[in-house]
Amino acid sequence: MVEMTETSNEKLITKIAVSIMALFLLVSWLPAFGMPLGDSHEGRVLGQFALHMKNFWSMGAADSSFGASWEPFSDIPYTHHPPVLTFLHVLVSAIIGEGLKQIKLISYVAGVLTIPALFSMGRNLGVSSKAVTISILMLIATPWWWVYGRLGLGLLPNVLMIGTIWAATTNPTKRKIVFASLATFFAVAASWHGVFLMPFLWFQTWRRRKFDQLTLSLIGASILGGLVILFWVSQGGGLSELGEHIGERVERDWTWSQFAQRQWDFAQTLLPLWYMILALPAVLVGLIDSRTRFLTTSLISMVIVFALVPSNGAWVHDYWNFPILLTLFPGFAVMSEWVIGFIKEKIKLTSPKKIDSITLGGFLLLASALILTLQLSDLHDEYFKETSDAGELIASIELSSGQKTAWHLPQVPWPTWVSNKWDVPTLSLLNAGDLGTVPSDDIVLFRIDRIPDWLDEKIEFAIEERKGKYATVTAHVMKQHVTGAKK
């Protein structure tokens, strides 16, 4: 463990490094900021919140279930998740209006703000600022973070809760207690992860302080957050509908060996090789070090429970286990601290300026190497540019007044962004029988590179509108290309 006392130059260097990382995210994310919502996780999630925002203002607070309505995509208010993100979208739209950039603003800003929040959290854990900075670099240098760090509020609510509670536990001033209570309310009312994690954090605080103003304030904040969730669910889809949704998440039609293989495939896609090699040591170090042991244990429990209980979510969504990045963060910070301490002992430079220069130069060299391995251009094209083609295609087509449903094949899943753009419900055509019910002049959206078995691949030559991998044809044309259909 390195000494926690740091010179003013060292503090300045770490602040510069953290600012550079936040700026890197801002600049590298900007190209996707103005792209239309399309066939991606971002398109599906933010398309949903675009509907929440639109319905709140068009239907009113009560009729829209306080923003939970996402008609016409679904008639049942969406209250499966705590309400803070929905409320934030409504608030932003009240200030700066509705639109594509307003929809994306919260997610992108939250992603950038997570960087200084992680730095503050790491320092409150008692880890040196240089080590925390390197751990942040390792986190943002993963495709998992670069792609999904801008989706919703991400890690931000829980990072704020952890950091402020640890700060208040060490030195419980009135101001820190207020910040910890507000952050706890925010995290609980923002995500189920926050609901799960809060009792662990409270227990650790109670062990140190027993019942005092801080522990009682945290109880009050979490209860208030829980009441907000209860109201949100009750006035929206209802507890029974939430139960049905949970039931869908725990159902499975796969084996656990298939599940493990699928998670491994996701990890290989979203995590670089160097990160996976260091992941196990990071877990062990996080558990060994007394400063990070309890937090690492709590976060491991959270990741395991959310992966294995609502396991169908982890089966379907590659981003489901995203919080694992936060779980490994403390361990990577401690490992970095050990390495920095070892290097300091070996180089034995007497000049602080030389040490500062080597530190900054080493950080920039490491950052450059890790960022180069990200292959940002390829990630941007695969996860944003190519999928936004679907949004551009939909935007270029004016739906006829006679078409009341946006038809699509299953290979374009959960297209909330289509409902948002065309203002009609969507329906997936699972087979030729479903296609047979579609009015002949209605258009159908599909992916050219993912033609289902019941369609002839020659349909590619009958396409009427196309953008990238996405295309539309009228139903009567698609019916002519059903496998075995008479021409």
Language model region names:
Residues 30-34, 46-76, 84:
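Extracytosolic helix-loop segments that constitute the early lumenal/periplasmic catalytic or substrate-binding loops
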